Structure formats: structure tokens, C-alpha cells
Swiss-Prot record:
InterPro entries (alphabetical): BNYVV_p25/p26
Source species, domain of life: Viruses
Protein name: RNA-3 uncharacterized 11.6 kDa protein
Pfam families named in the record: Benyvirus_P25
Length: 101
């Protein structure tokens, strides 16, 4: 599982271009001093919302259960954060899985 396709959405409106990335370590990503944003994608009603925070060290994968207007939307988003630097918005590959998986 090297290449993962993903896309960043601008608050559920216009999608950014999806990028393909290979990670040496898929569990921990080091920013090497660059400022990165960890973006959690929360899907609800087939829309995507960005929730992010700045991080200057390391970012671990986080599996989330979406809770937007729900209580739950029934999807989990596994977030993978690319190396990036401000003010550009990171592209983030994701894989959506059902709750049964």
C-alpha cells in the first residue's frame, strides 16, 4: 500500500487537485521543521469539511468517527498528512471505510 489517492476539499465546495504520495513511514510523518497542518476530514451528507491545526513536529494517523450535525455520519476518515509549508494548504490523502471494516 504505497500510493494513496486523496483530495482536499475547501469546506465541502470546490475540490482541490488530488495528489499521489508515497510515504516511507505511514505511521509517523516528520515535518523536518516545516509548518504543517493536520487536517481531519469529516464527511457528512456526502460533503467534506476541514478541521485543522498547525504542527511543527510530528503528526500521527488518527481514525475519526464523523460527528458534524449528526450524531454520526457513519463513515470513518483515516487522515494522512503530506509535508507542506504555509501559506499553501496541504493536500491530504484519505481512505474512507465503512464502520463494519
Amino acid at each position: 500500500m504505497g500510493d494513496i489517492l486523496g483530495a482536499v476539499y475547501d469546506l465541502g465546495h470546490r475540490p482541490y487537485l488530488a495528489r499521489r504520495t508515497v510515504y516511507e513511514d505511514r505511521l509517523i510523518l516528520s515535518t523536518h521543521g516545516n509548518i504543517c497542518r493536520a487536517i481531519n476530514l469529516l464527511t457528512h451528507d456526502n460533503r467534506t469539511t476541514l478541521v485543522y491545526h498547525n504542527n511543527t513536529k510530528r503528526i500521527r494517523f488518527r481514525g475519526l468517527l464523523c460527528a458534524l450535525h449528526g450524531p454520526y455520519c457513519g463513515f470513518r476518515a483515516l487522515c494522512r498528512v503530506m509535508l507542506c509549508s504555509l501559506p499553501r494548504l496541504c493536500d491530504i490523502p484519505i481512505r474512507l471505510v465503512d464502520d463494519d471494516d
